[in-house]
Amino acid sequence: MDSFAGKLAVVTGGGSGMGRELVSKLAAQGCGVAACDVRQAAAEETAALARAVAPDGTRVTAHACDVADAAQVARFRDEALAAHGDGNHVDLVFSNAGTGGAGSFINDPPEMWERVFAVDFWGVYHCARVFLPLLMKSTEGVLVNTSSVNGFWASLGAGIPHTAYSAAKFAVKGFSEALIEDLRISAPHVRVVLVMPGHVATNIVTNSLIAFGVPEKDAMEAGQGFYDTAPLSASGAADVILDGVRSGAWRILVGEDAHRLDQYVRAYPEDAYDYEKMSAVLSGSLAEDPARFGAQWFDEDTPRPGQAS
């Protein structure tokens, strides 16, 4: 896809973070966008920001939708088509909506765990189920599913359980990769793109806590540390994603931490839950002193075992 101009995109979780940035950046390039969020006001705010940077004639609409609810996703589809007047196709679907929480399968309430999994996996599934027929009517449809580095490393570090989110993101990764072959056979003009962000400055922690009933002030204080320590902005992440989609990539790692984790886990799967080593990977110190951990080929320029130099 050489250009987003004149296309129609759907973005879930468009009320903040990467979703908001995707909406604005797509609109700025002349792409019509239907943005949804579980919070109507947040989606409306995003749409207003996007319209301010969009060329004349570019339509951006806001919709309320809980992606965990299949009926709401179907309603969102109908509203988007009606609002954009195209009637029969969508060119891009960004399944970006997500939530956190329910880290412990043992200690957290089952309903909280199931809610996180429902948003983070079933939300992606529902969007694929509802929008794929419309993507198939596009000349070059693209389904962009957001997983996470937690889709290949189910941890936040030692002593921090992270089961619901990680399980869902692993499921998104597997589902997306399986769809690649399915579509190659059944709809070869439609692409699936798997996005795996690392630590990005978004309000997912704050929004997730508020959704589970934590007072807003407390949620904002708890989420501020996550936001402030992120090495990559939501705007920077959206740029990486859109560049990857435009270039034809099927797998997009977002952030240097994502690249480091992916490289190390692939090279040393048995070390994935050795927290001394993984902490070094995340901090970047392993790349500085790989021999300390026996990672002789952590640097991409170093030949791997069995690889010619």
Report the location of each language-model feature:
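Residue(s) in the substrate-gating loop at a strand-loop-helix junction
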Residues: 148
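Active-site helix of classical SDR
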Residues: 128, 164, 168
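The beta1-alpha1 cofactor-binding region of Rossmann-like NAD(H)/NADP(H)-dependent oxidoreductases
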Residues: 40-41, 64-76, 110
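SDR active-site lid
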Residues: 185-257
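Substrate-binding pocket helix/loop in short-chain dehydrogenase/reductase
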Residues: 104-105, 112-114
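Conserved glycine-rich Rossmann-like NAD(P)H-binding loop of the short-chain dehydrogenase/reductase
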Residues: 29-45
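Canonical Rossmann dinucleotide-binding motif of NAD(H)/NADP(H)-dependent dehydrogenases/reductases
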Residues: 2-34
